[in-house]
């Protein structure tokens, strides 16, 4: 029920001593409005009468307060003596109330004030704030407010103005908002303006937070009440002095209807950031990053910072994230690459360019987070091949054409090796066409290393019983310091060598076992066309002299035997032909991705910088200063930098005087194996390794 208001007065004052029960049901005061004080307090309408003077009647009213509902822990605190519930002695006061920010309220009122209501509750703007005067300084007062319907109409905003759209909806439960400082003395209330800025409006009829419940598209009038009482329990039978300010009426909406109201809120409310074009929030920062000028600036800064680095190196994961990488994942996840790429390159040209960078970086770089220097030949070559279409790394053509980019590759090798590389490249162009399937780094030492691009193509590594090893951390037992170097032409392995070390069935299970039965395994040294024998079964005392601990079963693999040989033991019992024919059907053995899902501990044993396992044990074209041994190379993630002593440890180059007949025989065997494996690969091209 709306209280009468006097339009000509700046302050409407209407005291009423005996309100009807429908005006102020006690549930509006206590049941929901102040749950922390009165969780389940209900009062009958009769309790809203005049102050009780008879002590017996006061006791009856106290019994009607249902104090038992307050819980046992509240009973002692809220039980009042009859004297405390008696009215206070009469105090001569004449309260006067003035509305704060009246000019701002008038601006809103001329246009038609709107207040947004939400399910979670929304504060009012302008906030309801008044200044009180004329109170007794010593007496205690309770200040509260409520919001009641201004009329019984429903409204709609049509043709830039509010119009009556019909009869009002059923009224929501009435709730009184008691100021949190109540009760307080008149002196305290008059010292500063009384603000109800914490009052929240909601349209949730089942609200449990004590918010004021309103209907959308209805007009409401806030009311301010002063009650002289020293206890909230006296509210039901105390005198209310109600003050109504007509300029504070508003229409409750779920979204602003009038653009002028929206602009007024933006101009005067410092918290109305949701409507502003500029701000410090995430939404505004996202808009700023999408501006073309800022995108160009981001690209320019990125280019200046990266210099000549390729796209793949800019897609490297952050160093903080590298410590969490498992060393057995063959390539970083494209999803992770996509996310980091979008985080680091806001100014990417298009989604198509992003996809190309993902594929290129997933093919070519090690996820161990070391950035490659601009002088890395593989990155330079990749940068020159940007304009060419993407090659499918799984197709046989791309593997056979792996050596076609040799001209552009060796142009960027350091000046110390130019002559040697030029001579090798010329000899390579004259060699057998099958040798072209060797990758671009054929003549660099074969680092038995993890997750790096293979020094041999996938087809040759399969023929060498290394299909599961060329992309995985398998041969790096120290995982730090200088890696083990094996030149492609420097191991000639017979089945006896593997069985002597306890690894025959292991390597036989990883690829077709026919390679082991055909005699000694060797790769082709493209420079001379000859294979140089190097005994693979290194003695334990030789490895111990280099500071390399040998595992229990005598092999070079530093991992527990049960991890690797459990699945391989069954495969070793099969014939060579059956192992070769059933291999493509088994995803564990067919794919070139890593199979062994264990995470070995790093062995903190370092190799002396001046002594190398292969500089003393094997003669070969191993140049420790070559591109494979650069600490920042894209194929090596060794955290130990090169030392001058390591760079000075040169060995004599190999004399190409091996038997041509042996090399031709080995080449023919490898060619037969490659052709057979290629046919098997084409039968099942989409096979993926188990996750």
UniProtKB/Swiss-Prot annotation:
Role of this protein: Transcription factor which acts as a transcriptional repressor. May also function as a transcriptional activator. Binds to the palindromic T site 5'-TTCACACCTAGGTGTGAA-3' DNA sequence, or a half-site, which are present in the regulatory region of several genes.
The written remark on domains in the entry is: Repression domain 1 (RD1) is involved in transcriptional repression.
Per UniProt, the keywords (alphabetical) are: Coiled coil, DNA-binding, Nucleus, Transcription, Transcription regulation
Q: Name one GO cellular component term.
A: chromatin
Entry protein name: T-box transcription factor TBX2-B
Record's superkingdom?
Eukaryota
Subcellular location, in the record's words? Nucleus
Quaternary data:
Binds DNA as a monomer.
User: Mind telling me which InterPro entries this protein's record contains?
Assistant: p53-like_TF_DNA-bd_sf, T-box_DNA-bd, T-box_sf, TBX2/3_TAD, TBX2_3_RD, TF_Brachyury, TF_T-box, TF_T-box_CS
GO BP annotations of the record are: cell fate specification; positive regulation of DNA-templated transcription; regulation of transcription by RNA polymerase II
Low complexity bias spans? 325-335, 624-639
């Amino acid at each position: 029920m709306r209280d009468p208001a006097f339009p000509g007065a700046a302050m409407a004052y209407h005291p009423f001593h005996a309100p009807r029960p429908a005006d102020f049901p006690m549930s509006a005061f206590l049941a929901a409005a102040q749950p922390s004080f009165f969780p389940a307090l209900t009062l009958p309408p009769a309790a809203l009468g005049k102050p009780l003077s008879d002590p017996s009647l006061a006791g009856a009213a106290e019994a009607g307060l249902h104090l038992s509902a307050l819980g046992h822990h509240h009973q002692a605190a809220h039980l009042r003596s009859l004297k405390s519930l008696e009215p206070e002695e009469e105090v001569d006061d004449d309260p006067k109330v003035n509305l704060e920010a009246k000019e701002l309220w008038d601006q809103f009122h001329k246009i038609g004030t709107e207040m947004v209501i939400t399910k979670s509750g929304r504060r009012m703007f302008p906030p309801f704030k008044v200044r009180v005067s004329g109170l007794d300084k010593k007496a205690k007062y309770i200040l509260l407010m409520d919001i009641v319907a201004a009329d019984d109409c429903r409204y709609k905003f049509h043709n830039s103005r509010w119009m009556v759209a019909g009869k009002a909806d059923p009224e929501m439960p009435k709730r009184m908002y008691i100021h949190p400082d109540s009760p307080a003395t008149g002196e305290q209330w008059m010292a500063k303006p009384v603000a109800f800025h914490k009052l929240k409006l909601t349209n949730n009829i089942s609200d449990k937070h004590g918010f004021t419940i309103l209907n959308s598209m209805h007009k409401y009038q806030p009311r301010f009440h002063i009650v002289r009482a020293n206890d909230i329990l006296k509210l039901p039978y105390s005198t209310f002095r109600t003050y109504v300010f007509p300029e504070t009426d508003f229409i409750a909406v779920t979204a602003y209807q009038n653009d002028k109201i929206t602009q007024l809120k933006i101009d005067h409310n410092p918290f109305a950031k949701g409507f502003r074009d500029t701000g410090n929030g995430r939404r505004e920062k996202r808009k700023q990053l999408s501006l073309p000028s800022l995108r160009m600036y981001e690209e320019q800064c990125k280019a200046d910072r990266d210099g000549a680095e390729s796209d793949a190196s800019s897609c490297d994961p952050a160093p903080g994230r590298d410590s969490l990488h498992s060393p057995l994942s063959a390539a970083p996840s494209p999803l992770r690459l996509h996310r980091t790429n979008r985080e680091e390159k806001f100014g990417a040209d298009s989604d198509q360019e992003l996809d190309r960078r993902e594929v290129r970086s997933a093919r070519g770089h090690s996820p161990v987070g070391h950035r490659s220097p601009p002088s890395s030949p593989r990155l330079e070559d990749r940068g020159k091949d940007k304009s060419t279409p993407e090659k499918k790394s799984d197709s046989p053509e791309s593997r056979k054409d792996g050596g076609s980019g040799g001209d552009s590759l060796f142009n960027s090798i350091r000046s110390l090796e130019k002559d040697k590389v030029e001579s090798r490249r010329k000899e390579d162009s004259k060699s057998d066409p099958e040798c072209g399937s060797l990758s671009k780094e054929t003549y660099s030492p074969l680092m038995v290393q993890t997750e790096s691009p293979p020094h041999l193509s996938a087809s040759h590594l399969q023929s060498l019983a290394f299909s599961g090893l060329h992309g995985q951390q398998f041969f790096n037992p120290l995982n730090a310091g200088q890696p083990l170097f094996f030149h492609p032409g420097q191991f000639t392995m017979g089945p006896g060598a593997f069985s002597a070390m306890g690894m025959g069935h292991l390597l036989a299970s990883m690829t077709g076992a026919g390679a082991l039965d055909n005699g000694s395994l060797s790769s082709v040294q493209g420079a001379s066309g000859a294979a140089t024998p190097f005994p693979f079964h290194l003695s334990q005392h030789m490895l111990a002299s280099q500071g390399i601990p040998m595992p229990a079963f005598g092999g070079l693999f530093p991992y527990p035997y049960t991890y690797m040989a459990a699945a391989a033991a069954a495969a070793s019992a099969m014939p060579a032909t059956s192992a070769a024919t059933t291999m493509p059907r088994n995803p564990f053995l067919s794919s070139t991705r890593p199979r062994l899902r264990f995470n070995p501990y790093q062995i903190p044993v370092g190799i002396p910088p001046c002594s190398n396992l292969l500089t003393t044990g094997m003669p070969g074209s191993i140049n420790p200063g070559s591109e494979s041994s650069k600490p920042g190379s894209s194929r090596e993630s060794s955290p130990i930098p090169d030392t001058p002593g390591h760079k000075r440890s040169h060995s004599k180059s190999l004399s190409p005087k091996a038997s041509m007949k042996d090399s031709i025989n080995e080449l023919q065997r490898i060619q037969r194996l490659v052709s057979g494996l290629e046919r098997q690969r084409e039968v099942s091209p989409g096979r993926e390794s188990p996750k």
